[in-house]
């Protein structure tokens, strides 16, 4: 829908038959690129249990029938596209691409795998929530660039086999930002920030090459060069160094992930480089967070809340549709991002720690439209996001300097600067409850209850218990065990 709103035509090929390259030719060769995702869940998580046993069903496939999505779906899909159309642009994105963008431990094979950008042989990878990146990339493709030539967009990873390309980064810090004025997105000028000196991720064996002279570090941006980003150039441990099972290799793997985790904020993240054999994977800094106005505009686009019609034609065992849709069809996304820092969770790596939220009017309008759906029974299943009760940034400092690299907002010793308030969320829930034909508004996203307990105003807790629990309170599971 976002691409359509910018004048691009999009054909959706839903869950193609990966065993038959001709199934990727249904719509012909795209003018600009194939945009490939494995869906809302990593394909290995979708296909296997934690005990490495095949799952009996796939809630994201037609009729819930298993076997319609391949293992390591992105790599398989890209390979099939390459067979069907040699030389076409292929860009990967979504949760599987985001979480596997560098060398990563793969639970199912019990090995460290290379970046999925290299394994899949795609041309470009979009990580995180890709609205800004995809519009900028589409515009550059329209202007005649190939996907392999696009190296200056936030929220993307690219690769090269030339050391000279890596060396050239030291002389090129002009990051290009999407100009999406048609959606009231900020222009590149609005997205520029002056960067001040800060502690970097310097470690003994891995160099951090400054892309600017130290004496220039505190200068304000030149008004004629508003996209000039003062970034550093950090070399991660190479794939060769992290792939083995030795203690030294594991330490370097942990170090690599630490550096990656410290560079998930759009304001203070640096450019990360990982060498694999003779190639280099380069991660540009994350896309800038969306403003409330931008979030509202995106969620006002004409989404249907229905599965792709192709799934009706592929009905399995007399069943059609996507079972997973029933859980979210009448839910509202009120926010993105999370500063909870749960050690097991990948949200920060995908959406970042900054909270991006929609306005009350936007959510009320969407809820009102839902009440007119013939399948709506009066129940809004969820109003939330990664963490339901986060509606604003953790502190004012995040808006200026980004989330702290070496300090968590919550945890055993919460930061004293965390602003605790549920007032905005309470007012939003009250407005949603008052909409005609709405019987109940439930919260099924996780409640971060240590944050809740920090709030001296108990209004939200009272409202939560009286109006918004559908059987059991949903909480973040990292708090249930003292160990």
What are these regions (language model features)?
Residues 351-379:
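Conserved alpha-helical substructure of the radical SAM core
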Residues 3, 315-346, 379, 472:
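N-terminal pre-triad scaffold of radical SAM enzymes
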Residues 19-20, 42-44, 97-101, 133-135, ...:
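Flexible loop/turn segments at secondary-structure boundaries
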Residues 17-18, 368-483:
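Conserved SAM/AdoMet-binding glycine-rich loop
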Residues 1-10:
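Short helix-loop-beta junction
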Residues 123, 298, 363, 475:
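Conserved, mostly hydrophobic/aromatic
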Residues 14-276, 283, 288:
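Glycine-rich beta-alpha loop elements in corrinoid/cobalamin-binding modules
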Residues 59-64, 99, 120, 279-281, ...:
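Glycine- and acidic
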